[in-house]
Every structure is written in C-alpha cells, then in structure tokens.
Amino acid sequence: MFEYRETLGINFDPSHLIWQGMDPVAALRELKGAVYHFHAKDTKVDPYNKAKNGVLDTGSYGDLLDRSWVFRTVGYGSDTALWKDMMSTLRMIGYEGSVSIEHEDGLMSVKQGLEKAIRFLQDVMITEQPAQMWWA
C-alpha cells in the first residue's frame, strides 16, 4: 500500500474507522507489517442520528444523545465478534505488540470504563502461542 521504514509504523485505532463506516479487520490485513501499536477504543454509531447528521458530525462530544457516533469503552460500541476478528487478525499479521486501552467514553467513569475494558479484552484477546497444527 505504501513504502515505510522499519522505524515508522501505524498506531492503529479502530474507533475512527468504525465511525467512518470502514472495516477495521480489512484495514489490519492491508496494513500487515506496518502496525506498531494498537488502541482498544470502540465507537457506537447511532443510525438515526447518522441518517440526519451524516458521519462527519461536528456536534459537541458531550451531546451524547444527538451525535451520529460517540466513542465507547470496548464492547459497548461494536459486538464481540468484531473484536474477536480484530484480535485474530492481529495474530495472523504477526502483531505481537501491546493493546493499549484508550478511554474516551462519556457515559462511564475512567475507573469503570477501564475495569469493563479489561474484563472484555480478557475474553477476546489471544495471549498464548498456538500449538503445532497436528491436523495439517
């Protein structure tokens, strides 16, 4: 997709792709070898407000009821299947770096958002190396 050096890589934040209607899994596949950091942050898109305002909503981030989309704690915007697909794809593209929780959820305290994000990610992250494929 583009030329890059070993010292230059992507800080992948799926939340921005989600509000734009893009597929973060497809983006991860395209960026194989260029992802150097991963942010665990989610977005909830409100279909009614999106139909009215579009995705380039310039309203206040504090206007949670009327915005087309809002940042959410992981698991409160997108379903578990998307997060499992992202974690699996990170493994397939060879990413072995950190998963950094970024809390920008206007509905939860930082403490509660962090606690919920940790619990959610514990279920979807792949932390052990796979066994040899004896069936292949």
Enumerate the language-model features and the residues they cover:
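Conserved, mostly hydrophobic/aromatic
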Residues: D13, F38, L90, V99, ...
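A general structural detector for well-ordered alpha-helical segments in enzyme core domains, enriched
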Residues: M1, A27, L82-T89, K116-L121
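Acidic/histidine-rich catalytic cores of soluble enzymes
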Residues: M1-V74, A131-W135
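A short, acidic, flexible beta-alpha connecting loop/helix-capping segment that sits on the rim
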Residues: S100-S109
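C-terminal helical cap(s) of enzyme catalytic domains, especially alpha/beta-barrels
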Residues: V110-P130
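A structural motif corresponding to the C-terminal end of an alpha-helix
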Residues: Y4-R5, D85-E96, E128
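Residue-level marker of alpha-helix boundaries and capping positions
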Residues: Y76-G77, M108
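Soluble or luminal CAZymes and related metallo-dependent hydrolases
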Residues: Q20, S78-L82, G113
